[in-house]
Amino acid sequence: MSPRRVTALVSLFSLSSIFVACSSDKSEKTDLTAELCPAKLTIQTDWFPELEHGGTYQLIGPSGTADKNSVSYSGPVQQQYAVGGLQEVEILTKNFDKQNSSVLVDAQADMAYIGIADLIKDSAALPLIAIAKTLDQDPQMLMWDPTQFTIKTPTDIAASGASFVHFPGLSYIDFMIDKGYLRPEQSDPSYNGSDATWVSKGGSILQQGFATNEIYKYENDILWKDGAPADVSFFTVSELGFDNYPATITMLKSRATELDACLKLLVPKMQQAWVDFYDNPTPITDRMIEINEEYDGFWSLSTELNLAGLQLLEEKNIGANSPDGTYCSFDETKIQDLYDILQPIYVSQGVEITDDVSSVYTNEYCQGAPGR
């Protein structure tokens, strides 16, 4: 064999070895990345499907499957959000039997919608951490019939003497009572999300709700006043001075630690889904109408309601970017201000909470997240 032939064979062998080694390294890295996330991700929301959950449903898109028995929506994650081996997403509606924090503790979901105010309240008792926002402002509101009550300022709520029907255990109720906006005897924690009490009482009560949903329903759909819909007035809780992050993506701290490498990849994708939803909400909001029909419960949506809700969401900056330009991170000053409001209230109630509010949230996983 000639020296030239030997040299050529050696060179060919060397190139082949390098190619195999590079291919092996690439394959190994791909395999490691593919195993970072669970194949199935379960997210517990705080209500039936509604536009305020749009970015979460965007992960699946309109082609998922609604299950009436489990009241859940599931399907393959859309390819543009697939990362770290994630294949399927399951979205659970509100669990009326337990708090969302208990759903996490019982390992029935990987993530759950929980507001920062409630995380503060439970901070000494439960090891939970918020990893991303879903909304920038809280659409939660207090509404009233303006023909029955003259309410111009928050203090007029207490002066009205009217019962305020709301869900139990809400932090903003503690705030309102502490500020003198609501007398303790006005608080009626019997709300179950339906319009039955309001209708039966002809709007002679105050009631909680989502400004981006119920305002349209009571003014256009629900026959509550003289056999017809009628105008209502409202304050959002932010307008009352309670500036909360609602429905944050929350996890058990131990689960977040376990999925740390996954979350660094996944959270920016989850927040991209929110940006994409806002850019083109109709496929998801239309599908939400159908999902609620398939659930066959008391909750319903309509095209007109969704359009009105999205308009109000923009007007009230409910879907605004964070100060750093992402649609993900938490404003440290905003959360500290909320903590400063709640801390003395809970001290007076004998409720133990953390001394360090930064322990209930992190912006670590928002690195690289997009903005609107």
Place the predicted regions along the sequence by residue:
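Bacterial signal peptide processing site
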Residues: 23-26
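Secondary-structure end/capping motifs
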Residues: 257-348
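Conserved C-terminal helix/tail region of periplasmic/extracytoplasmic solute-binding proteins
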Residues: 332-372
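Pocket-lining segment of extracytoplasmic ligand-binding domains
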Residues: 117-118, 192-197, 201-296
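C-terminal motif of bacterial Sec signal peptides marking the signal peptidase cleavage site
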Residues: 18-21
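Short, glycine-/small- and polar/acidic-enriched structural segments
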Residues: 30-192, 205-208
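Short, solvent-exposed loop/beta-turn-alpha elements that line the ligand-binding surface or hinge
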Residues: 64-84, 229-242, 257, 318-330
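Bacterial N-terminal signal peptides that target proteins for export
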Residues: 1-9
